[in-house]
Design a protein with these regions (language model features):
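Short acidic linear motifs
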Residues: 2-472
Length: 472
């Protein structure tokens, strides 16, 4: 069977149209790819431009802002006075079993009585056994009394989130040793040792110094809170703890800009992380989790410069907020605008919430320390006049240069005389101002409690009866 002349004539035309269609599709794909590449490069170049401007802005405001310059400018203590040097020695001298006994259920509810209530005899006996096993560590820890500051070099991991701070974290162990040393010194009537170990406990916190990471400063805040708590306990258990040196040290430490130390360092560390992401030293997946193996995932890298610029500007705004007086910091942080609603700006979008969480801890612990300074002044007033002051202004200037301000309001801290003692307190983060009580262990408002002499050193409550085995 033969094709008709008409069919033979139309076949070449069909092939021409097919070729044109294929060519059009190929051209469209080429154009689409070119558009994607151009858009990718445009995003990257726009980000690089913003990053250049952001880096210039922060350099004008803070010339030593990079990780290298910031650390080079940190102050180092004189030789022999660096508290940070003692921490690894104390750790090495501590028994590996330290703290394991107190982790048992039998002690769970009896390790945090009211400050004016004695620890139970079995708790004290266990503390003696533990301290005896780590006697060399305790002797080393007491030397911190003479080392009111500290410095250690921090080596950032390529992924800065994985930076190890072993010695910094071991400061918590040092605090644990010293708090029990304070407790047993009071039990033994060794008031000088109790006072020295209280100052050493505060200096354990200060050994962290200006370490430029949030984790470091959170540890410093936590250990300082332990020092405040055991200062409260010492005054509630003993009538004659020496106070002037401790008050001066706490007053100085209460004004340390711990939030600023951490925020400046985190800005520098975050910028180092971005640099490692852009250069491929750290895979993006290591920070953001698994990324899609498609165009969307590929575009993430083009957005890194803009994300970096946004993070740098936001962290710089946080640094400027942290430079303000404490009571102005919360409004300054709240005024920082939200980043653009861009799903590619993943890292910069999380910066402010992290700073705010650390700031809350900073304001709370600063309020605690300021309350402690005033509380010590109140106790010194009582020792001299045999009564509590009628108002905090009565402490000035003999016992205080001025009444410290509440970090939450900028107004002077509050004071209340109660039937069983007195309390210095802050309004707290909720601004409720209900910290003026002595006996509530659930009240979380920053405060420092003081008991009348006849209410101090109350006996420990009876030990809980052992649970009976159920009948067979």
């Amino acid at each position: 069977m033969h094709d008709s002349p008409a069919r033979r004539k139309t076949r070449p035309g069909r092939w021409r149209w097919a070729k044109r269609l294929v060519a059009a599709v190929v051209l469209g794909l080429v154009c689409a790819c070119a558009w994607v590449l151009v858009a990718h490069e445009r995003v990257r170049l726009d980000g690089e431009h913003e990053l250049t401007e952001a880096r210039a802005e922060v350099t004008d405001a803070d010339p030593d802002w990079t990780w290298e310059k910031l650390n080079a400018a940190r102050k180092k203590p004189p030789a022999g006075l660096n508290g940070a040097d003692l921490v690894p020695e104390i750790k090495a001298a501590t028994e590996p079993e330290w703290g394991q006994a107190f982790a048992r259920d039998e002690f769970a509810s009896r390790l945090d009585p009211l400050p004016n209530v004695q620890f139970a005899p079995d708790v004290l006996a266990q503390a003696r056994r533990d301290l005896k096993g780590s006697a060399d560590a305790v002797r080393l820890a007491r030397q911190l009394k003479h080392r009111p500051t500290g410095h250690r070099e921090i080596e950032l991991a390529p992924n800065v989130v994985g930076t190890l701070l072993v010695d910094t974290q071991n400061t918590r162990l040092v605090a644990d040793l010293l708090r029990w040393d304070v407790t047993l010194a009071i039990e033994d009537g060794d008031i000088r040792r109790a006072s020295d170990s209280l100052l050493a406990l505060l200096n354990a916190s200060r050994s962290i110094g200006d370490e430029p990471l949030f984790v470091s400063q959170l540890v410093r805040m936590a250990v300082r809170s332990v020092a405040v708590r055991y200062t409260e306990l010492a005054l509630a258990q003993s009538p004659s703890v020496p106070l002037i040196e401790l008050q001066a040290a706490l007053a100085a430490d209460a004004e340390e800009p711990l939030l600023l130390y951490g925020t400046r360092g985190e800005r520098a560390a975050l910028d180092r992380l971005f640099d490692n992401l852009q250069t491929g030293v750290v895979p993006l997946e290591e920070v953001l989790g698994p990324r899609p193996k498609n165009l969307w995932g590929w575009q993430d890298h083009a957005h890194l410069p803009m994300d970096r610029a946004t993070a740098l500007r936001r962290m710089t705004a946080c640094v400027e907020a942290a430079r303000r007086p404490l009571h102005e910091q919360a409004p300054a942080l709240a005024a920082i605008p939200e980043p653009p609603a861009d799903p590619h700006l993943v890292i910069s979008g999380a910066t402010l919430s992290t700073v705010e969480n650390v700031a809350q801890a900073f304001w709370r612990t600063s309020a605690q320390a300021r309350c402690a300074v005033v509380g010590i002044a109140c106790e010194r007033f009582r020792q001299q006049h045999r009564r509590w002051p009628g108002a905090l202004t009565a402490l000035v200037p003999a016992f205080l240069p001025a009444v410290p301000l509440d970090p939450y309001t900028g107004e002077p801290l509050q004071f209340a005389k109660l039937e069983s003692g007195a309390v210095v307190y802050s309004v707290g983060s909720d601004r409720r101002g209900d910290g003026g009580t002595l006996d509530s262990v659930s009240n979380t408002a920053p405060r420092f409690r003081l008991w009348n002499p006849d209410q101090r050193r109350r006996p420990a409550p009876p030990a809980p009866a052992p649970e009976r085995e159920p009948p067979p």
